[in-house]
Amino acid sequence: MVLASLQSELTSLRVCARLHCVMTAAEKALSTFREPPHMFNCAQTVCAAFGRDDLLEAMKVCGGGRAPEGMCGALYGAIQVAPERAEELKAAFVAKNGSWKCSELKGGTPRVACQQCVAVAAQLAAGEEA
């Protein structure tokens, strides 16, 4: 009985692992955005989607409009993941969302949901269609 239960659990874990491998960058990022146990902010969640755990501590202070120059934290995280494409990422993000500044995206009546910023930034960093 215990063996059958363990085998079933192992099968479930394998299926989950396979599904995680085929998730898009946006899906990976959104799966950790403001979700327990980590409660990652926008910048952290984009970095985590690419396995960049080395950036998570530094990105703690970059959510909620606190990234340098008031940049959207999700975009800032994407730039940390792919710094060689910083200008390309910024231009594509602006084309999709209308701005790169968090205050312009969120100020007053929010124009773009944080989840959309996270999804777009992750897709762009991965080179996926945003």
Language-model segments: residues:
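C-terminal binding/interaction regions
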Residues: 88-130
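Helix-rich "cap/lid" substructures immediately adjacent to catalytic or cofactor-binding pockets
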Residues: 35-61
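Short, positively charged and aromatic/hydrophobic N-terminal segments
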Residues: 18-19
